[in-house]
């Protein structure tokens, strides 16, 4: 009897896989979905099984099937807050932001201080262009999250500037707080700091930021050129010319194998082009 049951279970899994193999891109997920489907066929009133299969469908980007399983799980009595989060996340991924906001709102009624949920709420509000509310929610995330990442800081800055496109002061403060927390040489934050300094017209601080990159990184030739290009843009041709010469010197100091690499060859062309442009402006 036990062997017959095992054989029947294996047959059901193989049958499910053979019918749906073309629909599934990832073998491991396909197998796990198949196993959940067999388990549901054996225990059709198990709310947790439907929720678990819904998560697998969502991971497999089969959103309609995932949503159907989430609702079925709820209909069978699953009132856990995690279902509301998953539904909110799914609606967010499918760009149904109003429904996403309803679901995450229900979740937050149960657990108002959950950082992950507050972050999703902020992201949903951002897509709904409710920037002030989005900023409030994400501010809570930034001040509460213990495992903050550079991309969290950058997303927060995007919301700050969406709420007020001139508020580079707050964005730069957020970047600095991120650097203090994650380390002063966090590249993505330092790059964004340079962007914000340039966008806000803080030319001297932007030049200091270029100097930071020149001092910090071995391949100085690229940063000398970028600095020269910026100097030319702000009408400082003499300083730009000096920076181009320093870029050329840095290239000459490279080992032969690096000098002949296509990015360096292209950089030489860009240096020559910018030098010509500066000389033409002088004459």
Task: Provide a role label for each language-model segment.
Residues 23-71, 75, 262-282:
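N-terminal leader/linker segments that initiate helical-solenoid repeat arrays
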Residues 59, 93-94, 127-128, 161-164, ...:
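Register position in tetratricopeptide repeats
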Residues 39, 72-74, 106-107, 140-142, ...:
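Canonical positions in the second alpha-helix
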Residues 52, 86-89, 120, 155-156, ...:
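Canonical tetratricopeptide repeat
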Residues 42, 76-77, 110, 144-145, ...:
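Structural marker of alpha-solenoid helical repeat scaffolds
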Residues 184, 208, 230, 241-283:
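Terminal, low-structured helical/coil segments at or just beyond the last alpha-helical repeat
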């Amino acid at each position: 009897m036990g062997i017959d049951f095992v054989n029947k279970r294996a047959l059901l899994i193989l049958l499910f896989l053979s019918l749906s193999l073309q629909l599934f891109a990832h073998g491991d997920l396909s197998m796990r979905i198949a196993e959940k489907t067999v388990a549901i066929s054996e225990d059709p009133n198990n709310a947790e099984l439907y929720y678990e299969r819904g998560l697998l469908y969502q991971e497999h980007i089969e959103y309609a099937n995932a949503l159907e399983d989430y609702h079925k799980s709820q209909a069978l009595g699953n009132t856990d807050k995690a279902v509301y989060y998953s539904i909110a996340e799914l609606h967010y991924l499918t760009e149904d932001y109003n429904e996403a906001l309803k679901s995450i709102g229900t979740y937050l009624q149960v657990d108002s201080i959950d950082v992950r949920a507050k972050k999703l709420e902020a992201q949903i509000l951002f897509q709904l262009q409710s920037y002030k509310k989005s900023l409030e929610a994400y501010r809570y995330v930034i001040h509460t999250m213990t495992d903050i990442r550079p991309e969290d800081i950058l997303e927060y800055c995007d919301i700050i500037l969406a709420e007020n496109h001139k508020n580079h002061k707050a964005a730069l403060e957020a970047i600095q707080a991120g650097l203090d927390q994650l380390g002063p040489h966090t590249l993505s934050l330092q790059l964004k700091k340079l962007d914000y300094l340039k966008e806000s017209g803080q030319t001297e601080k932007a030049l200091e930021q270029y100097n930071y990159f020149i001092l910090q990184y071995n391949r100085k030739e690229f940063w000398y050129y970028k600095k020269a290009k910026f100097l030319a843009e702000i009408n400082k041709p003499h300083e730009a010319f000096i920076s181009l010469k320093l870029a050329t010197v840095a290239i000459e100091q490279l080992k032969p194998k690096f000098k002949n690499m296509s990015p360096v060859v292209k950089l030489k062309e860009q240096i020559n082009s910018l030098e010509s442009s500066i000389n033409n402006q002088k004459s």
